[in-house]
């Protein structure tokens, strides 16, 4: 489906010369004199190469038809990461390069959004927040309670996050998956 370049947003998938690209950033520039343009940074899905394109804001760009659905994570093996669609029970294998650094968040039964094109997974969206357990943390240094100080902690999935002083080993916490920041103590 053709769309004007100025309508492209982060996460959109475009088809340029038969290759799929996922939009990383899209900015519209309106100079005082001259034609407004849209600057788009993209990543080629096939090999991960980053590309930067500039179009006139009114130019037509081919937007790929992408199917986005919820999937449940099942397990990981030599083939890749296995997900199941909860309604039809269809299973799909996702390659490690699509999952990327988010693999540390995957737990059995976790619900994620997968974007597929021609039944091939092209991107994955993790939940905004996940609950993890702290395995080890440094002891509290006396006198650090006046300001909002944080201390490093190691989680069960191997992540290193900064947590408030009152968090100790064995505590379950909620972290933000985008910036790995502490959100709150888990309520379970």
From Swiss-Prot:
Keyword Protein biosynthesis attached: yes
Single biological process term from Gene Ontology: peptide biosynthetic process
Subcellular location: Cytoplasm
Molecular function per GO: translation elongation factor activity
UniProt keyword annotations, A-Z: Cytoplasm, Elongation factor, Protein biosynthesis
Primary subcellular site in the record, as a coarse category: cytoplasm
Pfam families, alphabetized: EFP (PF01132), EFP_N (PF08207), Elong-fact-P_C (PF09285)
CDD domains xrefs: S1_EF-P_repeat_1, S1_EF-P_repeat_2
Pathway this chain belongs to: Protein biosynthesis; polypeptide chain elongation
InterPro entries: Elong-fact-P_C (IPR015365), NA-bd_OB-fold (IPR012340), Rib_uL2_dom2 (IPR014722), Transl_elong_fac_P/YeiP (IPR020599), Transl_elong_KOW-like (IPR013185), Transl_elong_P/YeiP_cen (IPR001059), Transl_elong_P/YeiP_CS (IPR013852), Transl_elongation_fac_P (IPR011768)
Any single Gene Ontology cellular-component annotation: cytoplasm
Classification via HAMAP family: EF_P
Recorded family membership: Belongs to the elongation factor P family.
Functional description taken from the UniProt entry: Involved in peptide bond synthesis. Stimulates efficient translation and peptide-bond synthesis on native or reconstituted 70S ribosomes in vitro. Probably functions indirectly by altering the affinity of the ribosome for aminoacyl-tRNA, thus increasing their reactivity as acceptors for peptidyl transferase.
Name under which the protein is recorded: Elongation factor P
Native species: Cereibacter sphaeroides (strain KD131 / KCTC 12085) (Rhodobacter sphaeroides)
Gene designation: efp
């Amino acid at each position: 489906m053709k769309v004007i370049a100025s309508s492209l947003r982060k996460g959109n998938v475009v088809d340029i010369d038969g290759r799929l690209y996922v939009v990383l950033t899209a900015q519209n520039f309106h100079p005082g004199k001259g034609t407004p343009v849209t600057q788009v940074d993209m990543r080629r899905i096939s090999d991960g190469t980053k590309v930067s394109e500039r179009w006139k804001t009114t130019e037509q760009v081919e937007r790929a038809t992408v199917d986005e659905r919820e999937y449940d994570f099942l397990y990981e093996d030599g083939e890749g990461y296995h997900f199941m669609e909860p309604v039809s029970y269809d299973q799909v294998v996702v390659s490690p390069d699509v999952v990327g650094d988010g693999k540390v968040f995957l737990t059995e039964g976790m619900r994620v959004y997968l974007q597929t094109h021609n039944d091939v997974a092209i991107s994955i969206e993790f939940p905004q927040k996940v609950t993890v357990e702290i395995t080890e943390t440094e002891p509290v240094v006396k006198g650090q309670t006046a300001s909002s100080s944080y201390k490093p902690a190691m989680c069960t999935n191997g992540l290193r996050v900064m947590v408030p002083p009152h968090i100790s080993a064995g505590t379950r916490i909620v972290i933000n998956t985008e910036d790995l920041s502490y959100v709150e103590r888990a309520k379970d």
